[in-house]
Amino acid sequence: MKIVAPVMPRNVEEAQSIDVSKYQDVNLIEWRADFLPKEDIVSVAPAIFEKFAGREIIFTLRTSQEGGHITLSDQEYVDLIKEINAIYNPDYIDFEYFSHKAVFHEMLDFPNLVLSYHNFDETPENLMEAFSEMTKLAPRVVKIAVMPQSEQDVLDLMNYTRGFKTLNPEQEFATMSMGKLGRLSRLAGDVVGSSWTFVSLDQASAPGQVSLADMKRILHVLESED
């Protein structure tokens, strides 16, 4: 299971002052560009990609529709993604499938999509249908993050992940049940078939994230042969 940590600068000065040594035990860097004004994203990008040269980067524009900090039309959203990709070709690009389905056809040539769905209110009853629709599109990664209202919601998310991974062994999944109630799902990825777990360093990018230090300790125990 790969560890993903976010970088969330709010201006170019913060981007330039990122301490990359804090990320040495992280497998993937997620640049949450939505913490910037939309007109600053392209100008801040060089600082991010230079800081993390040689590291795998996920470019994410988490919009307000899915718990993020930026509001964009469908066309603004896809145009920004295309601009960053054309210049920097990040290893992964997050695409909010259900929020921007109208422009998904413009992303069909992208081989490195993280097709994502976030629901900060609930674990929807149609979660299995969401898994199915996104998996059929065969992106690089299917990412699903939902908020549980009960222990059963957490177990449902984990069971669906395991089921779809079993049926689609070549497909990568990154799934999590958010908040304190859902923390178990962030720790048990290897058991259910979730390839990534998202951790926090100085600031969490989603509720229920475990700190990098704690995650390293937990994974050490879980992966130990003794």
From Swiss-Prot:
According to UniProt, the reaction catalysed is: 3-dehydroquinate = 3-dehydroshikimate + H2O
Q: In which pathway does it act?
A: Metabolic intermediate biosynthesis; chorismate biosynthesis; chorismate from D-erythrose 4-phosphate and phosphoenolpyruvate: step 3/7
| Keyword field contains Amino-acid biosynthesis | yes
Which key words are in the record? Answer: Amino-acid biosynthesis, Aromatic amino acid biosynthesis, Lyase, Schiff base
Q: CDD domains given for it?
A: DHQase_I
**Top EC category:** lyase
Residues given in the record as 3-dehydroquinate binding sites:
E30, W31, R32, R62, R186, S205, Q209
- Which Pfam families would you find in this protein's record? DHquinase_I
List the InterPro entries hit by this protein, alphabetically: Aldolase_TIM (IPR013785), DHquinase_I (IPR001381), Type-I_3-dehydroquinase (IPR050146)
GO molecular-function term, one example from the UniProt record = 3-dehydroquinate dehydratase activity
Kindly indicate whether the keyword Lyase belongs to this entry: yes
Catalytic residues (UniProt): H118, K143
* Cited Gene3D superfamilies: Aldolase class I
Q: What is its EC number?
A: 4.2.1.10
The highest taxon in the source lineage is Bacteria
UniProt-listed GO biological process terms? 3,4-dihydroxybenzoate biosynthetic process; amino acid biosynthetic process; aromatic amino acid family biosynthetic process; chorismate biosynthetic process
HAMAP family named in the record: AroD (MF_00214)
How is this protein organized at the quaternary level? Homodimer.
The UniProt function text for this chain reads: Involved in the third step of the chorismate pathway, which leads to the biosynthesis of aromatic amino acids. Catalyzes the cis-dehydration of 3-dehydroquinate (DHQ) and introduces the first double bond of the aromatic ring to yield 3-dehydroshikimate.
The record's comment on protein family reads: Belongs to the type-I 3-dehydroquinase family.
What is the protein name given in its UniProt record? 3-dehydroquinate dehydratase
